[in-house]
């Protein structure tokens, strides 16, 4: 099984690449979706957020007010660290279970779409690591257009993350998403060919069929050894 890491920066276009993988038939584990699930009303993640930030971050129906919580953590680095620390175990567990379900289905290649791939050290479990990159001016412009925020707000949100240029330097594959959608799709095809190459022996060993084969061969070997000893 090949675990492909996919990350980028806010408004870099990572979701576009993630959707292209899905459209190509490659399963994607989306950490943002996992994160939303682990903070639903009544969950352990929800309880930790309420304990740390109070009822001010709740909507009338008791769900987390994501916009309000975002305003708080993007303007205060310490509170952002608190939030990440509280939710990291829940999100990691959620990602693990999504991977396990796909492993049981026999999927050979799985993309992990994780905004905090480097921050959570999950890049160590993925190869290749793909970073979707744009220059800062484009990133600010797209973020302002998408979210209707001011330039200052856009810069604050960008600065709240690891520098995209640093992520780029750590990547195995970089997708420059500064151009048009058609240009990005063309670049994606090369990336798709790369991640769809035959699995290495280590990756085959991690796959469902590979592990099954190892267990069966080991069991047969043990039985034969016991027979020879009798």
UniProtKB/Swiss-Prot annotation:
GO CC aspect terms: peroxisome
Question: Can you state which reaction this protein catalyses?
Answer: 3'-dephospho-CoA + ATP = ADP + CoA + H(+)
The DPCK domain, residue ranges: 3-206
Enumerate the residues binding ATP. Answer: 8-15
One GO process term, biological-process aspect = coenzyme A biosynthetic process
What are this entry's molecular-function GO terms? Answer: ATP binding; dephospho-CoA kinase activity
The pathway where this protein functions is: Cofactor biosynthesis; coenzyme A biosynthesis; CoA from (R)-pantothenate: step 5/5
Q: Which InterPro entries match?
A: Depp_CoAkinase (IPR001977), P-loop_NTPase (IPR027417)
UniProt keyword Kinase, yes or no: yes
Which UniProt key words apply to this protein?
A: ATP-binding, Coenzyme A biosynthesis, Kinase, Nucleotide-binding, Transferase
- Domain of life of the organism encoding this protein: Eukaryota
- What is a single Pfam family found in this protein's UniProt entry? CoaE
Entry EC no(s)? 2.7.1.24
- Listed CDD domains: DPCK (cd02022)
Under NCBIfam families, the record lists: dephospho-CoA kinase
Give the matching PANTHER family: BIFUNCTIONAL COENZYME A SYNTHASE-RELATED, DEPHOSPHO-COA KINASE-RELATED
Role description: Catalyzes the phosphorylation of the 3'-hydroxyl group of dephosphocoenzyme A to form coenzyme A.
Recorded family membership: Belongs to the CoaE family.
Name the chain's protein: Dephospho-CoA kinase
